[in-house]
Regions:
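Substrate-binding/catalytic cleft of secreted carbohydrate-active enzymes
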Residues: 1-188
Length: 188
């Protein structure tokens, strides 16, 4: 990994360094379980200690799609104390009812947000188009950025996933990203 970061340093590429914490299917169970605290902290601390001197790393990410709980709040507090110069990101932070974007993260992040409303195919009856119900789950990135009750930057941490011929809509994504100064961009 160090060679990659050295290349990013020399080429001027920005990196979001992510701890390897991912628990698909468990919906935050481990993030809220004290027995997992040490394992969560170990991954984040080792990442930050290992990579702290690479100027290409502009942001720490606590993990991905693992729900939210006290273990992530503790990681965020540690990262902010260890390195107050870099923002802290975590895509799964929106998992808390009533507090979808806790202040323990510095960046609001979603994956696979949708862009234009017409992609929902509103003229098709429910059930006729399997994609319609699936697409309706995802928030629209621009709507998140236009919320006035929060001034943190907004980004899509995963988008344009390439499965079948699904890769695309780059122009539509970037038109929306460029339309609002709170938008940071995204990761493919």
């Amino acid at each position: 990994m160090s060679r990659w970061y050295e290349l990013c340093d020399s080429l001027g590429l920005y990196v979001m360094d992510e701890a390897d914490i991912e628990e698909h299917g468990l919906r935050g169970t481990l993030a809220s379980t004290p027995d997992w605290y040490a394992a969560f902290m170990d991954r984040a601390v080792r990442m930050a200690e290992r990579d702290k001197n690479y100027p290409s790393i502009v942001m720490w990410s606590m993990g991905n799609e693992s729900g939210y709980g006290p273990n992530f709040a503790a990681i965020s507090a540690w990262l902010h104390d260890f390195d107050p110069t870099r923002p802290v990101h975590y895509e799964g932070a929106q998992g808390v009812d009533g507090n979808p974007d806790p202040k323990t993260v510095d960046v609001i992040s979603r994956f696979y947000t949708r862009v234009k409303q017409e992609y929902l195919n509103p003229g098709i009856a429910e059930g006729e188009d399997k994609e319609r119900a699936e697409n309706a789950r995802w928030e629209r990135l621009l709507e998140i950025a236009e919320r006035t009750n929060d001034d943190r930057p907004v980004m899509t941490s995963e988008y344009a996933h390439s499965m079948g011929n699904a890769l695309g809509n780059f122009k539509e994504y970037w038109d929306e990203i460029y339309s609002n100064p709170r938008m940071l961009g995204g990761f493919i």
